[in-house]
Amino acid sequence: METLNLIKNDPWLEPFEDAIKGRHQHVLDKEAELTNKGKQTLSDFASGYLYFGLHRTADGWIFREWAPNATEIFIVGTFNEWKELKKYSLKRKDYGVWEIKLPADAMRHGDLYKLIVHWEGGCGERIPAWATRVVQDEQTKIFSAQVWSPEKPYKVKKRTFKPNTDPLLIYECHIGMAQQEDKVGTYNEFREKTLPRIAKAGYNCIQIMAIQEHPYYGSFGYHVSSFFAASSRFGTPEELKELIATAHGLGIAVIMDIVHSHAVKNEVEGLGNFAGDPNQYFYPGARREHPAWDSLCFDYGKNEVIHFLLSNCKYWLEEYGFDGFRFDGVTSMLYYSHGLGEAFCNYGDYFNGHQDDNAICYLTLANKLIHEVNSKAITIAEEVSGMPGLAAKVEDGGYGFDYRMAMNIPDYWIKTIKEKIDEDWKPSSMFWEVTNRRKDEKTISYAESHDQALVGDKTIIFRLIDADMYWHMQKGDENYTVNRGIALHKMIRLLTSSTINGGYLNFMGNEFGHPEWIDFPREGNGWSCKYARRQWDLVDNKNLTYHYMADFDADMLKTIKSVKAFQATPVQEIWHNDGDQVLAYMRKDYVFVFNFNPKQSFTDYGFLVSPGTYEVVLNTDNPAYGGNGLTDDTVKHFTIADPLYEKEKKEWLKLYIPARTAVVLKKTK
């Protein structure tokens, strides 16, 4: 095998060439095995959802389940009074597959059903592993699979939508908590009420959390039980498909927060002990249980598990029209330790034999499959260790993700706000942090996501303003803490979004500084949705200051989108001075200037730029965004020649930059 581009692009990886090539060869060998040496495609292999589970046929129904440890399986449901009848007994076929064919009148759309699985020494009720619809009884809270075969099913149109990744601007959202009311929101409400807000705000992609069915609402969707079922607490499959189609009509891509890093422990609702075999889907021994998440870890070395998970990826793309995935918990998959207690200080930590090569192989195959099914699909890795090659091309020796989350950035901002007084905020440190990434891998930059909004943590705006958000967000209050918070909120988001090399992400409501943390209904809060909703009335009320942040956010995105391939343009630092707390950098014809100094405004502060005329296109101090309006944004700024820099073709751009403000200028001539 020739030297891979991953190593050519980073000479520091040369000592680990054998390990990198070994992982790459593992992927090639596994792909050859699964595709019968290329006689079929990965997409052909990943079509299990068309075979397993319940399907309507021309003359009735057919149901199949993989349960090699079972001795007997019955379908029970509302159609047979939940009794084990011979008529509903499955027959064992080859390779641990069980099958039953039923006449058309044996069940109907809307019927509830489960399996009763028998094995040596026991039996139990189970929801089918490939169930595409699972519902919960309002009174008993019991989950059951549901026959889903409407007379007029929603047909997903042939794929013509092409996501706009120039740049990718992601709105992270959750269907259930997207509404104003103290309740669980629905797909229809999101489509009718929330999508228009997102489109107006300027985002071109939504990343939806908690789609795969999960027994406990408060898990935020991360303890999945039924991997092929769209959560029924939000509505029907048809309603989710219509939501996605409507988003496409608005120019918005839809990606799913997919959970393949672990599964819920539940045995009746989930896969935990499907047919009396606790290791049917999961690793044996100590590796079966995740020590931190109270969940189960898939056995990525088992072909049947790879088949299940790859089919799951293809299912959501083909059956619902999703445009891709954000893979949750990738760090947990990559390492035997799940990354817990690891520092990841040097490259040796990525190639020391503590990595799960089976999981690495699965993730790489998943990326190959997803892009085979849809070449325009988007894949994003949530990964905190910094594993090299994660978002590099497979043929270059990488794992094939399109993007990786820049998880260092929100950590940096929270640490800065928590631990440093304003006078100690260092622009050199900020710039290094937001641009600290591998040159051959694209990232999704973000100041905060849902992680920072969860109960026990605080959003950026709440850390900045805290209790004053309850009393002083009205216009005219002139509260110092509020004014400071809004100013820094705008500056932090501008610095984060304007230095992207791939995309930018915002969590639902944070664009306008949504107050308080997220606390899902649970026994400890009386099962209330009060803190698991979005208070849109705050941003809609023009007597409050929330809309200043939302208006700035929208114009910030407009500025970014006005530059073709903005994310691909070099970020060139012009100046930083930690004493003054001033930072300036350029992208194409745009100059970004920040003054983080809390007290000192600067007159005629000079920056060396290419000669020309510069005009203000965005200013955090604009009164329209809650600023003080200390500068005239209509003034044109002409550069001043200096013989010292004539050879470098640079001239001085001199500006008045008020304290705690940022401005974006465009070279117009």
Residue ranges, per PLM feature:
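Surface-exposed beta-strand/loop patches in extracellular or lumenal glycoproteins
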Residues: 63-67, 73-77, 597-613
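The feature marks proteins involved in alpha-glucan
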Residues: 1-58, 62, 83-84, 89-172, ...
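C-terminal beta-strand-rich structural cap/linker in extracellular carbohydrate-active enzymes
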Residues: 109-113, 588, 633-669
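Conserved, mostly hydrophobic/aromatic
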Residues: 65, 115, 173, 198, ...
